[in-house]
Amino acid sequence: MGRVERRETVETAKRSEIVETAEAAEAAEAMERLGKQILSVCRDELYFSMRFMDVALSSFVYRMDVGISPFGTDGHTMYFHPRELGGLYKENRILANRGYLHMVLHCVFRHIVKRPPGRRAFSRDIEREQNGVPAQKEEEQRAEDKAQRCWDLSCDIAAEHIIDGCDLRPVRWSRSLLRRETYRKLEGSGHTLNAERIFSELAKWNLTEKELAMLEQEFYVDDHRYWESRDENRPPDEQLNNKW
């Protein structure tokens, strides 16, 4: 191959790469537009049934994030995975509506800034500490991890319990047996089912890993990674506190 031919081959490859990059960027923009449209439709459908929630429903900007599953919020922005959100909406738009309202309720009840009430209810090591025997670091970490998981679960159950009790067309959905039984046990306490109360009740159940995982799967709706409470070193967001 001569010098001219090699130069032409390189230039052709560069042009192809530029075209592919432009096409990928265009496709990403189209996916982001579609995701934003879906969330806007969810907001509008919820508004027509819950006009008193107007301000809360309209308090977000929407941003694509392929690292999230399927969506999540930090109180300012709703992040969404375009394919997962699109798939959810295609499966049934009610699921997307419920997800939107679920995230709004996390903000309204300030789940996004609250930290787990504590790990003591999930650790037998406390008894050892009280007797002057220090807990092992690994055991402490397991207790903290379980407390965090149960707190996330408690926040999700609190939001879902409200949504399931709405009986409004945009969010009406059949409940599984596990969900019905979970509500029945929690309601038996006779207390208002806020996240703190649910957390306290879950601690009494002595959940096995399998039982906890089943409940997490049943009530999982959104990704909590952007919650202020997930980063202990993050300073309080005054704008967020004033907003919610």
Please describe what each predicted stretch is.
Residues G2-K14, I18-N97, V104-W244:
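Short, functionally important secondary-structure microenvironments
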